[in-house]
Amino acid sequence: MLKRLQMMVALGAATLPLPLSAASVPVTLTPGTAFTRIGSRDIAMLGFNGTCPGPEIRQRQNDILRARVENGLEDGTLVHWHGIRLPNAMDGVNVLTQDVIIPNEGYEYRFPVSGSRCRNLLVSLPLPFLRTGRPRTVRPLIVEEPAPPDVDQDITAILFDIRLDDTGQFDMEFDRADFITAGRLGNLMTTFLSSEQARLGDHIRLRLINPTPDRIFEIRIDGLTGFCVAYDGMPLPELVSLGNLKLAPAQRIDIIADVTGDVILRETVPSGGEELGGIMLNGQRQIRSAPIAPLPANLVPAPGEITQTADLFMQGGAGGGAHGGFGGWAFNDVSGLPNKPLISARRDEAVQVRMVNDTAFPHGIHLHGHHFWETDQNGARTHLRDTTLVAPGETMTIVCVLDNPGAWMLHCHMLSHQADGMATWMQVS
């Protein structure tokens, strides 16, 4: 059954619903059951407004986003606006920023995207998916530049990973091994695309988003000649050539490229080339002669003197040593949010966090409300990101200017790991 479904998915990726504009009118988000078509089968999922993934929201920088959430679920819920710089009260994190929206109640999120340093974002609904047996839902939020690059198409690609049972429906069984190993990985992968056709010679922008709970994707894209231009919504000062692209859960990559054939996305691990979906040729145009240029930089304060440092030890999991936490995973011998923040800083302080992965599994570590610099082995700052992937046995040091007041979560974005202990927070006053 699963092999047959995988073959049907390989014939074509699913299409995202048409985008919504939220520049002048509020958007209503209604979480509930939605049926996602994969291959020839409708699969019951959680969705926004009857679709999963929900239709993307598009805004320009300087817009005010207004989103009303009407909770018709049997559980409390929140909406977290992943990767965006926003007021702390709008971050959608239980305990730290707001109480859950109880069933049959509503809540309006309202914040400017003028200060956003991100160009492609993700809205996720952190439902109690481990209890309901259904995954959280996602909806892309695209924040466009005041003067976007001149492209023929701007295409969103949402990577998707799901575990199906023998009947081809969502597998509602959970195993302890899902929490203490690499996470709850699916047995079927695909891609939801906002467009599935392009002309030979088209100049396109492709926004790759990995919203999956636990899977790390390693992608090869056939049929494109171009460059990576942004990581996690932050423009790269120098273009990065297209090779195999690794995206941990919550990471994003922007690409600008020319179409040179059918555009096929392939997962290279472990199958070595499983087709996830594609953009098929329909017509032809002359390839542009102008070279691809980097995107305009976002305004980010450069760190001055480092005023605070902290160590974040990742502990636990299968094959890991003992730790002081109650869960399968821990940060610094604590499972779950500790009473005291990892760092308590004044606004605009530059801090450094040394992340030590003392486990047998990789972890994608995400900071809310900010971006940070990854550093190399010599301590030099490299890429601005909001999520960094730390391999087993690796130490990654990040530098961040904490210039957004509030209580901000720092956690593993392999959500099975977060649910079983990998979470802490920072306080900015």
What are these regions (language model features)?
Residues 6-23:
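N-terminal export signals
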Residues 24-30, 131-165, 237-362, 401-407, ...:
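Extended terminal and domain-junction accessory segments
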Residues 69-73, 208-211, 355-359:
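Asparagine-centered strand-capping/turn motif at beta-strand->loop junctions
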Residues 75-82, 215-222, 363-367:
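Short, hydrophobic/aromatic beta-strand segments
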Residues 52, 56-59, 81-116, 191-196, ...:
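Extracytoplasmic beta-sandwich strand-turn segments characteristic of Greek-key/jelly-roll folds
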Residues 153-202, 209-213, 324-334:
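Acidic-aromatic/histidine active-site loop/patch
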Residues 39-61, 184-196, 321-347:
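N-terminal edge beta-strand
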Residues 63-65, 202-206, 349-351:
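Structural beta-strand segments of beta-rich domains
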